[in-house]
UniProtKB/Swiss-Prot annotation:
PANTHER family: TATA-BOX BINDING PROTEIN. It comes from Natronomonas pharaonis (strain ATCC 35678 / DSM 2160 / CIP 103997 / JCM 8858 / NBRC 14720 / NCIMB 2260 / Gabara). Pfam families: TBP (PF00352). Keywords: DNA-binding, Repeat, Transcription, Transcription regulation. It comes from the Archaea. InterPro entries: TBP, TBP_archaea, TBP_dom_sf. Sequence repeats lie at residues 10-86, 101-179. General factor that plays a role in the activation of archaeal genes transcribed by RNA polymerase. Binds specifically to the TATA box promoter element which lies close to the position of transcription initiation. Belongs to the TBP family. This is TATA-box-binding protein. One of its GO terms (molecular function) is DNA binding. The keyword Transcription applies. GO terms for biological process: DNA-templated transcription initiation.
Length: 187
């Protein structure tokens, strides 16, 4: 059977940064080709990069959130493109603004079906939320790493809240060993 850690795939990386000054988004939107700005729908300007694929949400405060990237390297590359585009518009941007990863969303596959009712009881109700009438996944909150894992009956997992790519590997290890301890990964 394949090691579940080998199935881990980064689905989304969200990071934030800022340029330390307020922006006139209306004027930026007019000068920045491909920018979407509709303040009645959303307070930020949306600028999409194609290579790597991501979206930068640029706010009047100068704060920028990058979402949709598939790796932390892609986040840095996407934001470098955004910074360069802003500099092209004569907007002052520091040489190397701090970029903080806020959330890494990953998926993985345990490779077998899971009995979520048994898992809910085995893991203890203080660490989980499981209401199949509301949502088909079991929500499992881990402390170390500080992530939330969604477990589905198919054996698929979604791990959210990670700050480092290794957080997902660590979470999968802990989930697998905990389920094995409880005898809930057999067959």
């Amino acid at each position: 059977m394949q090691d579940p850690k080998e199935t881990i795939n980064i689905e989304n990386v969200v990071a934030s940064t800022g340029i330390g000054q307020e922006l006139d988004l209306q004027s930026v939107a007019m000068d920045l080709e491909g920018a979407d700005y509709d303040p009645e729908q959303f307070p930020g300007l949306v600028y999409r990069t194609q290579e790597p694929k991501s979206a930068a949400l640029i706010f009047r405060s100068g704060k920028i959130v990058c979402t949709g990237a598939k790796s932390t390297d892609d986040v840095h590359e996407s934001l470098r493109i955004v910074f360069d585009k802003l500099r092209d518009l004569e907007i002052q941007v520091d040489e190397d603004p701090e970029i903080v990863v806020q959330n890494i969303v990953t998926s993985a596959d345990l490779g077998r079906n899971l009995n979520l009712n048994a898992i809910a009881i085995g893991l203890g109700l203080e660490n989980i939320e499981y209401e199949p009438e509301q949502f088909p996944g079991l929500v499992y909150r881990l402390d170390d790493p500080d992530v939330v894992a969604l477990l589905f009956g198919s054996g698929k997992l979604v791990i959210t809240g990670g700050k480092e790519p290794d957080d997902a590997r660590e979470a999968v290890d802990k989930i697998v060993s905990r389920l094995e301890e409880l005898g809930l990964l057999d067959g």
